[in-house]
Design a protein with these regions (language model features):
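Primarily the dimerization/phosphotransfer
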Residues: 27
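Metal-dependent DNA phosphodiester-chemistry modules and their immediately adjacent helices/loops
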Residues: 156
Length: 167
């Protein structure tokens, strides 16, 4: 995740601030902490835990209790690390597995308590947009169209864009 595009534009920040991004993916949950200074974000910490939540969906598309517990345990550890952060410093998003799970609301209610921050289940197009922006900012500027492919645990995004804008 390129954190500079994970957050809404931050106005009037003259001193360095910490920001955190949490990605609840199908295979792993990730926590990335960065320091914002003068419009730039520098990563200072990255934690990735393999929870395999997508593999915990049963035939009826419900998350099994073991998969939910693994997610809650991970988010509790992330929450401990984020103690002292304010809600405006943290953005947590969930992707395909929680878009798909019929009992996502039950998981998310406790997940928010474990983490201590809101968790947003983002749409496929929003996930693709964030992926494209993150990749585009890491590549050299080009006037050519770009194709970015993200192969995830339960979904694959193909995003075409130009410069820093996904189409």
């Amino acid at each position: 995740i390129n954190m500079s595009h994970f957050f809404h534009k931050i106005e009037n920040m003259s001193s360095p601030h910490l920001l955190a991004a949490i990605d609840l993916g199908s295979n792993s949950f990730r926590l990335e902490i960065g320091r914002e200074s003068h419009g730039q974000i520098t990563r200072i910490e990255y934690i990735k835990e393999t929870v395999r939540q997508g593999a915990g969906l049963d035939a009826e598309r419900n998350l099994k209790l073991e998969a939910m517990q693994a997610g809650w345990d991970c988010l509790a550890r992330f929450g401990e690390r984020l103690r002292g952060f304010r809600p405006r410093q943290v953005r947590a998003v969930a992707t395909q597995t929680l878009r798909e799970a019929r009992n996502a609301d039950a998981f998310l209610a406790r997940a928010r308590e474990c983490l201590g921050f809101p968790i947003e289940v983002i749409s496929g197009p929003e996930e693709a947009r964030l992926i494209y922006l993150g990749v585009a900012h890491l590549l050299p500027q080009s006037s050519e169209k770009r194709l970015v492919i993200d192969i995830g645990g339960r979904s694959t995004e193909l995003i075409i864009g130009h410069h820093l804008e996904p189409e």
